[in-house]
């Protein structure tokens, strides 16, 4: 059993286990340029970037960054999102959510069981990936790990 401790100042969690960074089963698209890094807000309602935004080729296939169950599919302020409650939640009891945003199209629905690498939609001009653990935002790059092959599991390909 792994105990994950989070520094929840300003609604931002740090993935640590007894002070050591903890890698979670989340894979990020290592083949895409980052447009906007994670920038924690200075207060709960302040501006910042609660995830990472990647440059994409519009229409590219978007694969799930984690395995789990889809808990939300919809448009927020004109932007399509897919939220996955990861299988890690069952293992640790921590509520770990991965948000995929700025999607042009979505090919899953709420309640679907998703495997890492499964197609969840098509990319827009960019792709947003955010991570929340027990309601606290955390830097996806601090928590992401590679698959057992050492290769990224979430990649985009021209569709």
Q: Which residues does each predicted region cover?
A:
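C-terminal segment of classical bacterial N-terminal signal peptides
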Residues: 2-10
């Amino acid at each position: 059993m792994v105990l994950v401790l989070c520094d929840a100042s300003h609604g931002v969690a740090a993935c640590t286990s007894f002070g050591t960074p903890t890698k979670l089963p989340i894979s990020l698209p290592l083949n895409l340029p980052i447009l906007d890094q994670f920038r924690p807000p200075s207060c709960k309602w302040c501006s910042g970037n609660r995830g990472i935004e990647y440059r994409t080729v519009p229409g590219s296939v978007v694969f799930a960054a984690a395995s789990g169950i889809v808990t939300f599919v919809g448009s927020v302020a004109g932007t399509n999102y897919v939220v996955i409650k990861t299988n890690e939640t069952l293992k640790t009891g921590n509520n770990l959510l991965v948000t995929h945003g700025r999607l042009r199209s979505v090919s899953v629905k709420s309640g679907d069981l998703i495997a890492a690498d499964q197609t969840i939609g098509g990319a827009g001009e960019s792709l947003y990936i955010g991570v929340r653990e027990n309601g606290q935002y955390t830097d996806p790059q601090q928590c992401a790990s590679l698959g057992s092959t050492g290769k990224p599991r979430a990649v985009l390909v021209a569709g």
